[in-house]
Amino acid sequence: MIEDEKAGLQPMDISDASVFFFQADVESKDFLTSLFDCEGKSDDRMLRYADAIIDVQNLNFDVSPQCLQSNIAEIITKFVLLSQDGSRRGLSRSFNFIDPDIIAGCREEDAIEFLLINFVRCHHELGKSGTSNCYKKTLESTRKAVFSVFVMIQRGYLESQLRSQHASLVFTKRLLEDTVSNVFLRTLVEYLASTDECDEDAITETFNPIFGILRSGIICQRFEDNKDEIVRQILRVMNLLLSIRLPSNGPRPLSNLLVNREDFLPTPSEKIQGREFGLMSFLGPFFSYGLESSARRPNHRVFVDCEEDARKYDGSVNTEQKLYFQRMDPIRTMLHQLMLPLASDQGSRNKTLRWIATIISTNDIRTRSHYDPSDVLCDHYMTNFLSVMYMFSEKIDLSKIIVDYPFLPSSLINISKETRLKMDESGAVAFASQFADRPDEYHFSTVCFFLTIAAQRLVIPPLMNQISEYSRHLKELKHKINALKEKLNTVSGFERAEVEKKLNYETEHWKLMSRHLLCVKTQAQDPALMASSMDFVDKQMKFILNLLCDNLDLLGDDSQLPTEVSQMFCALPEYFLEDALDFYIFAISNGMKLLMERNADWISRLTVLFTQYHYIKSPFLVSKLVRVLSSIQPPLWFNVVRLRMAQENLLMCMIKFYSDFEDNGDFYEKFNVRGNIQYMLEKMEEDMFYKGKFMDMARECGAEFIRFVNMVINDATWCIDESLSGLKSIHDVEKKMANKVEWDNTDQEIRNQDLGVYEEAKRKVKGWLGTAKSNLKLLLSITVNSPEPFRTPVLGERLAAMLNHNLSQLIGSKASELKVKDPRSYGWEPREFVSLLISIYLKLNMPAFVKYIAYDERTYSPEFFHNAIECMRKNSIVGFSQLESFEHLAEDVKKEYEAKAELEEEYDDVPEEFKDPIMDAIMVDPVKLPSGHVMDRAVIERHLLSTPNNPFNRAPLSHNELSPDSELKAKIQEWICQKRNSKK
């Protein structure tokens, strides 16, 4: 007391302190007694309440907080151990994975209920102002005691009286019902994470069983059962638990706990498959909720009576699909919310990224053309997975992406075996070696960006391939069903029963596969997924273009673009670009409305890339780029033709690539590429700038343009020949079938062979006739606007020969062999073909081309043209004015033909040294080859257009290596003059 006076403190009367502590004890005892209020309790439960109240009255509060907590915990433990099975809670929600018969009204429910209620009371009292320190100590000790008992129950320390498994089920159910306060959870986690309060295993043994119950719960849900509300509650609770942080923005203990579970990252063996890992891992079942279907086990419970919708190709969706979109959108958002704390917390981030990377690496066979679906995760799982990755990538700033990450030895994406944009395998290895010593740690944005690109590869292209494959399969099934229906009308008895059985089987198969296709389309056409894809792919393309040119200004000119691309760009995997192109191809057909609502910079980027297609090694990748551009329709097409950076090069690149693909690509893909370029040229005809540029190129007759026109002639020739040969085969078989008696008596094996030829011929005609027509129309367009290239012998002679040959086929002596029963089903309109040929003839009615027609020794003769004119007149194949113009052309050609005959007679003794060694005709412009051989320029240039080598030794040869033989040319001209003078 004296010391207090020296310190200047007012001395306290001992009696006042006694009163203070007495009042605090009373307040504490009253509060603790209220926890065990027995009012309204049944007689059989009264005893334990009374015992607890007596224990409270005997408590000594003048002890340390730890001792007080222990004493209160002992009272609570004693009380809850006497819990009894009671009545079930009213209005309790039902969850199909928690058996109500096990936990409803059980002792554990009573105990948990008691603890939760009393925590709330403690928290409420602590929130009051003016609380004395002594009373506050009691409240805090009581709260910790509640946690202590709760944890003991959950850990199984009281297993003989209170079963931990039942307690976990009860608590999980309360979490799902949202009847556990967030404060309780947060404070409980803080208590468990405190080394002063609990051992390191406490949090694991308390919450791991709860995580296990939630995981089991999600496994029990089936999309077709429409239990979305349960799924949403499970995901909500998972997010709630994982998001709990320690004070002062500390770590998330439960996120760390989850990623350290053994089943979070099951150790993948060398043989582990994607499906096995995806479903074994803890998070797997959460991503597995959705519209499940496979070709082996089609989902027969969905899209019933909607099978015809599978045949639609316009991107439209039916009501049932829209319903599935609405159901999955909130669930995918909640999946992202579940993953967000795992990816955000420093302690759990690395393992979470490793889980994502392992899902990708173990399912990488989804990128193959053919794979066993049982080895990989299903489409709905991967679509959910990709949706989450897209959400992670929404806020990524490209300026913060470390571009060298994919090349690091420790990178989570493995690109070592990937084909590069413009680098061979050894170059890629050498390029990656420079990053061997880079640090392993990279920020989340970088890793997430590249993982999303890798994940996208496993989803978008496979879905597109499946839609294409199953659509084709359904089309074949429909043809088969129609054929069986026709056959059903012609058979009877046992054979009819067999046909009916087969028809029923094929019809049922068609229905199942239609439903499966609708399931696949539903995954791919989800508008939320497509919108996210558009945003990410736009970011992806911007990233690729940035490697070409930093801060590329799409409104500027092409001077920004480098002559040589960076090594980083060259080393990028092809799929970085290819997957973006695949998505745009799909989006143009199925999400045009979404594309129209977005910035059109993506079109500008693709156009720029095509005008510099030499940056890309693979012609197939460039062909896919062409396919995207050709698919763009007005008004978006305006962004292609009006891009300042591309205006100078776009047309030339189209023409050049048209020819370049000849030797680099697949035979059939060649026609696809050229068809796409032809379609782009058609659209450009409406643009005066490009129309004028095309005419200028034609007038210049540069090497690339000559090469381009030659390819058009080649393709037209081949496609027409294939189509006409197919029509002849159809005609021959139909002729046999028309004689029913003879056909019925024909050996079955021979009939089957003929029918095989018949079907193959029909496919061939349908496949090539449209391409033939397109090439003829392109030739006509060139002749209308720019006939100059056909003045040159190298092209004029080839086109004249092609026109003559095909005209003779169509209206010559064997034209009747092209008549078939149903020509329109193949797109076969012979009058239209003849009209196209005549139009090309007439547009090239100039002296040089007239000469080329007359000099065609293979087909032309005056009688041939005369007969053709009579046939067209008799059958009114072309209009009167066209026919009249063609008659005038025929007269001019006849005169040139007669003049040629005179020259041949005049030059019948041409010296051998003046003759072209291949054509055996007098040379007009002799040139020397590097091998020393001499040829006529027109002949060797025509040869080089299709085969760039020396015809005598097969050595590579180009136009630039041809040197004029002026001396020989002078001798030939002198000889010709002498012959003419001698004739006079």
Curated annotation (Swiss-Prot):
According to UniProt, this protein's pathway is: Protein modification; protein ubiquitination
Membrane topology note: Peripheral membrane protein
Q: Using the record's annotation, list all stretches that form the U-box domain.
A: 909-982
For this UniProt record, the keywords arranged alphabetically read as follows: Cytoplasm, Membrane, Nucleus, Transferase, Ubl conjugation pathway
Q: In which tissues is this gene expressed?
A: Expressed in the germline (at protein level).
Phenotype of the disruptant?
Number of germline apoptotic corpses is decreased in response to ionizing radiation-mediated DNA damage but not following UV-induced DNA damage. Delay in the dissociation of rad-51 from DNA damage foci. In a hecd-1 (tm2371) mutant background, the decrease in the number of germline apoptotic corpses is more severe. In an atx-3 (gk193) mutant background, prevents the increase in the number of germline apoptotic corpses. RNAi-mediated knockdown in an unc-45 (m94) mutant background restores motility.
One Pfam family assigned to this protein is U-box
List localization entries. Answer: Cytoplasm; Nucleus membrane; Nucleus, Nucleolus
Cite a single GO BP annotation: ubiquitin-dependent protein catabolic process
Q: Can you state which reaction this protein catalyses?
A: S-ubiquitinyl-[E2 ubiquitin-conjugating enzyme]-L-cysteine + [acceptor protein]-L-lysine = [E2 ubiquitin-conjugating enzyme]-L-cysteine + N(6)-ubiquitinyl-[acceptor protein]-L-lysine
Please state the Enzyme Commission number of this protein: 2.3.2.27
> What cellular-component terms does GO give this entry?
cytoplasm; nuclear membrane; nucleolus; nucleus; ubiquitin ligase complex
Instruction: Please give the Gene Ontology molecular function terms for this protein.
Output: protein-folding chaperone binding; ubiquitin protein ligase binding; ubiquitin-ubiquitin ligase activity
The entry sums up its family as follows:
Belongs to the ubiquitin conjugation factor E4 family.
Q: What is recorded about the protein's domains?
A: The U-box domain is required for the ubiquitin protein ligase activity.
State the function annotated in the UniProt record.
Acts as an E4 ubiquitin ligase mediating the assembly of polyubiquitin chains on substrates ubiquitinated by another E3 ubiquitin ligase. The elongation of preexisting ubiquitin chains preferentially targets ubiquitin 'Lys-29' and 'Lys-48' residues. Also functions as an E3 ligase in conjunction with specific E1 and E2 ligases. Probably by regulating protein ubiquitination at DNA damage repair sites, coordinates DNA double-strand-break repair and apoptosis in the germline. Required for germline apoptosis in response to DNA damage downstream of cep-1.
Quaternary structure, per UniProt, is: Forms a complex composed of deubiquitinating enzyme atx-3, E4 ubiquitin-protein ligase ufd-2 and cdc-48.1; within the complex interacts with atx-3 and cdc-48.1 (via DDDLYN motif). Forms a complex composed of cdc-48.1, myosin chaperone unc-45, ubiquitin-protein ligases ufd-2 and chn-1; the complex targets myosin chaperone unc-45 for proteasomal degradation; within the complex interacts with cdc-48.1 (via DDDLYN motif), chn-1 and unc-45.
Protein name (Swiss-Prot/TrEMBL)? Ubiquitin conjugation factor E4 ufd-2
Query: What gene is this protein translated from?
Result: ufd-2
